[in-house]
Amino acid sequence: CDIDTLYNKLLPAEAVPQKLKEKLSKSELYSSSLTISVALNCTAESLGFKDVMLYLFNDETKRTEHISGDPHKSFISILAPTVRDKTLAPEGQGTLNIFVPAWMMYEDNWKTKVNEKGEFVRTDEYKALKEQFAQIIFERVEKQVCPNLREHILFYEVATPVTYHRYTHNKDGS
């Protein structure tokens, strides 16, 4: 869990000094991420992924933009776990995990609605935004590393900060 949940919800109130709680309430959390888990119809190596991890960024982009959550400017981390461990996919196939910094407040909480319980409701607009973001990332990966990546995708799943919040209850999906 995140530090806010730990100190303010899980531990007994008397276990954490008030001064520490105040300090923590002012701390800035690290971004969450948008994660694209990809199943390939070929090996990752055959598409040019020779290393287990690849980091894509533009030297001319400011560091603050690299972590901004903007799908056009944020850095991209690509993990190709099947480069090292062939047992993670059927023979002749591969996987990629693509990570991009993302923030919960992006596009009005990813175009979700909040219900009476305070839960994020994933709308059709949310699903469309998630897909649009993923396609921008695929386009960038194709430009910089693998020109025909989308032709080799069997399946992919996209997780946003909303997804991480849903399953972990971490503040802002961080």
What is each stretch, according to the model?
Residues 1-91:
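Mid-domain catalytic core of redox enzymes
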Residues 12-14, 113-115, 155:
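Short Gly/aromatic-enriched secondary-structure transition segments
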Residues 59, 83, 103, 158-160:
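Residues that form or immediately flank small-molecule/cofactor binding pockets and catalytic motifs
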Residues 6-9, 101, 136, 140-144:
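Generic, well-ordered alpha-helical scaffold segments in large soluble proteins
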Residues 77-79, 138-139, 143-174:
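A glycine-rich dinucleotide-binding beta-alpha-beta segment and adjacent secondary-structure elements
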Residues 74, 86-136:
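Glycine-rich, aromatic-lined ligand/substrate-binding cores of catalytic
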Residues 38, 98, 141:
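Hydrophobic, well-ordered secondary-structure elements that form the walls
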